[in-house]
């Protein structure tokens, strides 16, 4: 019982950490990365599909993303999806491939991105705290139903707090690394 609650809580922490990593990977820094565009949704064949299913995405230079659609008829739809995204990138095409130059970020834009990173990290920390509260409530219910002892309840609460502290440190580190990446000129 106790281990089930703790295992479930650990799984939530892993999901939250991975979700943060995934979200931060899509935030543009001054360097080109396929992660910036691979999950853009493109209207294709009567439905919405992620770009990485419609094209080969490569980064031949530090400030250039090259997108080679599997179907040349998709170039306009892919360009439209890029222009409608909030990336602020201007695609150009030669009929076969789309070139996406990634300009260096202005100081003002870097500061905005750092704020976005901090905000997202804080949102995930709030989610972690809410999960902690739910896990502790689950333990208290088990104790009230006499399925675990009071000592087990306290051990469980301590373990959950240790996991929360470790996860919070990891989230802070992920955020700090992304901030440093954004601020690097």
UniProtKB/Swiss-Prot annotation:
Keywords on record: Cytoplasm, Protein biosynthesis
Domain of life: Bacteria
InterPro entries: Ribosome_recyc_fac (IPR002661), Ribosome_recyc_fac_dom (IPR023584), RRF_sf (IPR036191)
Disulfide bonds: none
GO biological process: translation; translational termination
Molecular function terms from GO: ribosomal large subunit binding
Subcellular location: Cytoplasm
Pfam families linked: RRF
Chaperone as UniProt keyword: no
Gene Ontology CC entries for this record: cytoplasm
Cytoplasm as UniProt keyword: yes
The protein's role, per its UniProt record: Responsible for the release of ribosomes from messenger RNA at the termination of protein biosynthesis. May increase the efficiency of translation by recycling ribosomes from one round of translation to another.
Family: Belongs to the RRF family.
PANTHER family: MITOCHONDRIAL RIBOSOME RECYCLING FACTOR PSEUDO 1, RIBOSOME RECYCLING FACTOR
Name this protein carries in UniProt: Ribosome-recycling factor
Gene this protein is translated from: frr
């Amino acid at each position: 019982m106790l281990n089930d609650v703790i295992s479930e809580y650990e799984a939530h922490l892993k999901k939250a950490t991975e979700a943060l990593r995934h979200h931060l990977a899509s935030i543009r820094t001054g360097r080109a990365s396929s992660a910036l565009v691979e999950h853009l949704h493109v209207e294709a064949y009567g439905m919405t599909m992620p770009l990485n299913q419609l094209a080969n995405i490569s980064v031949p230079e530090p400030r250039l993303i090259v997108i080679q659609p599997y179907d040349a008829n998709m170039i306009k739809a892919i360009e439209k999806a890029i222009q409608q995204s909030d990336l602020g990138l201007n695609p150009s095409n030669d009929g076969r491939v789309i070139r996406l130059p990634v300009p260096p970020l202005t100081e003002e834009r870097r500061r905005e991105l750092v704020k976005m990173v901090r905000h997202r990290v804080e949102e995930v920390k709030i989610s972690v705290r809410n999960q902690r509260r739910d896990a502790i409530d689950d333990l208290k219910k088990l104790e009230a139903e006499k399925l675990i002892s009071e000592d087990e309840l306290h051990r469980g609460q301590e373990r959950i707090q240790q996991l929360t502290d470790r996860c919070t440190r990891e989230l802070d580190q992920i955020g700090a690394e992304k901030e440093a990446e954004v601020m690097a000129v």
